[in-house]
């Protein structure tokens, strides 16, 4: 598509170059630029895309979109100006790739906890209902026969629109997508209208210099999803649901356990354990449902998926089958071992998620509840204090270690976690083992019959980042290999 057609009514202005320049792709990473690419210069806190424009052109980019002119670009390179490059990038990518979101039923899931599990449960239900479903989120992007890792829960708009195009071309009619607050703030999901939006819950998270300024801003961006939905599905038990729903024009459908709701589960849900798999069973309108994940929060996630599925017209048989059969990598994921104790791997990496998980595991009455965890480098220090505090309060023994330290010294991170441990319960015993692999070995070597070992923070991730270098690190494999040696 040429620049003239591509930029029509987008607010972009051609500063110089040929309006008939053909564009075949849109990117914001100069390393991904190639012949026919439109490179979008995104300003950022730590790096400015304008500084990489020449590199993108050298790689073959046919045009550059900027907020201001970039000196030194070759004469043959077309240069576009836009006041809001993120909005412009979303509009241009959607147009170039043929507005793929319009060809599918789009479902967005947002909230502090439960996005990934709810999205996977809903996708499983819709697949059981006969739909061809794509899934985008923290665990990557997948559709039948395809799977790719992602750098963000919600990818940059140029990447997202291309992925949606590939889904449509491969026959997908539905897409379930986790929509993060940062994805909304940075317009990664712009140009997408959602048939259904799902709100799971809200608690303080992603607050810091590189994320949200405060909780009010975090809430603002969470509710932004529902300004682009035809139907909103809301957790009516969440204390912030009133603020999330305030002033919205979409049709609202609520779910819950404690408060009156359109879809309400009985409060007498049961914990289940079969074949080493922890689960729960609950009742809605006299019908019994099972979900293969433990605890109250799994009931809430299943209720969210059930409610959204009903809004979308899924059959009851599909709802039962999808909820019972779904497995989510890195979400209270059991590691099958021939051992008298249980090991679960979970992505819980903030105070709220860790508290929900540990309280749930406590309900299974373990001999000891052992938490193995760290916190990421170059992220909010408040998260470290919170993780340390909640684990000290709810675990019987803590093993603190690294978790994607990035460029920050591990000892600095561990010092913050230790401060959190003292705040939570200074009497809780703990071990400090900076190497995460050795920390896992330590937990396994000292496990007692009836223990539950919860390895927190990385979940589905397949690498660990140290000093800017990512190394292979799959916790399920580490546990299985060490125990089976």
Predicted features and spans:
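Phosphate-binding loop of NTP-binding sites
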Residues: 10, 89-236, 240-248, 285, ...
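Residue-level signal for inorganic ion chemistry
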Residues: 6, 37, 56, 92, ...
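C-terminal helical cap/extension that packs against the catalytic core
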Residues: 5, 9, 64, 68-76, ...
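Short, polar loop motifs at secondary-structure junctions
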Residues: 64-72, 137-140, 236-240, 257-258, ...
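N-terminal leader/targeting and accessory segments in enzymes
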Residues: 1-91, 95, 227, 239, ...
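Short, flexible loop segments at boundaries between secondary-structure elements
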Residues: 207, 471-485
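Beta-strand->loop->alpha-helix junctions that form or flank phosphate-binding loops
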Residues: 64-68, 249-275, 291-296, 320-324, ...
């Amino acid at each position: 598509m040429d620049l003239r057609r591509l930029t029509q009514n987008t607010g972009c202005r051609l500063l110089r170059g040929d309006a008939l320049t053909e564009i075949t792709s849109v990117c914001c990473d100069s390393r991904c630029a190639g012949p026919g690419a439109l490179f979008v210069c995104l300003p950022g806190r730590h790096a400015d895309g304008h500084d990489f424009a020449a590199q993108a052109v050298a790689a073959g980019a046919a045009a550059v979109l900027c907020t201001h002119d970039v000196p030194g670009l070759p004469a043959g390179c077309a240069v576009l100006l836009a006041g809001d490059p993120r909005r412009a990038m979303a509009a241009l990518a959607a147009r170039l790739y043929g507005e793929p979101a319009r060809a599918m039923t789009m479902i967005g899931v947002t909230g502090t906890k439960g996005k990934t599990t709810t999205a996977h449960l809903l996708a499983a239900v819709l697949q059981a209902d006969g739909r061809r479903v794509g899934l985008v989120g923290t665990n990557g992007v997948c559709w039948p026969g395809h799977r790719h890792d992602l750098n963000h829960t919600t990818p940059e708009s140029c990447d997202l629109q291309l992925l949606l195009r590939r889904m449509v071309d491969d026959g997908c009619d539905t897409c379930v997508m986790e929509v993060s607050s940062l994805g909304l703030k940075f317009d990664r999901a712009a140009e997408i209208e959602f048939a259904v939006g799902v709100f799971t819950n809200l608690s303080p998270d992603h607050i810091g210099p590189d994320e949200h300024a405060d909780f009010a801003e975090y809430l603002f961006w969470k509710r932004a999803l529902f300004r682009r939905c035809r139907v909103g599905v809301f957790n009516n038990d969440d204390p912030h649901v009133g603020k999330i729903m305030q002033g919205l024009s979409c049709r609202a459908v609520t779910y819950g356990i404690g408060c009156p709701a359109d879809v309400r589960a009985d409060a007498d849900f049961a914990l289940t354990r079969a074949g080493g798999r922890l689960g729960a069973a609950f009742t809605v309108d006299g019908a019994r449902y099972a979900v293969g994940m433990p605890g109250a929060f799994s009931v809430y996630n299943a209720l969210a998926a059930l409610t959204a599925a009903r809004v979308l017209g899924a059959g009851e048989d599909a709802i039962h089958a999808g909820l019972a059969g779904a497995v989510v990598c890195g979400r209270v994921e059991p590691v099958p071992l021939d051992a008298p104790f249980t090991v679960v791997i979970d992505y819980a990496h903030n105070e709220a998620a860790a508290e929900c998980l540990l309280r749930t595991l406590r309900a299974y009455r373990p001999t000891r509840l052992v938490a193995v965890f760290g916190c990421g480098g170059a992220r909010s220090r408040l998260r470290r204090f919170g993780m340390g505090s909640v684990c000290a309060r709810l675990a019987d023994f803590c093993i603190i270690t690294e978790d994607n330290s990035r460029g920050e010294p591990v000892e600095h991170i561990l010092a913050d976690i230790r401060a959190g441990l003292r705040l939570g319960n200074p009497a809780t015993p703990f071990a400090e083992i900076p190497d995460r692999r050795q920390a896992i070995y330590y937990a396994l070597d000292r496990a007692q019959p009836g223990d539950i070992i919860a390895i927190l923070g990385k979940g589905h991730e397949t690498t660990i980042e140290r000093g800017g270098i990512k190394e292979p690190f799959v916790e399920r494999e580490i546990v299985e290999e060490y125990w089976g040696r």
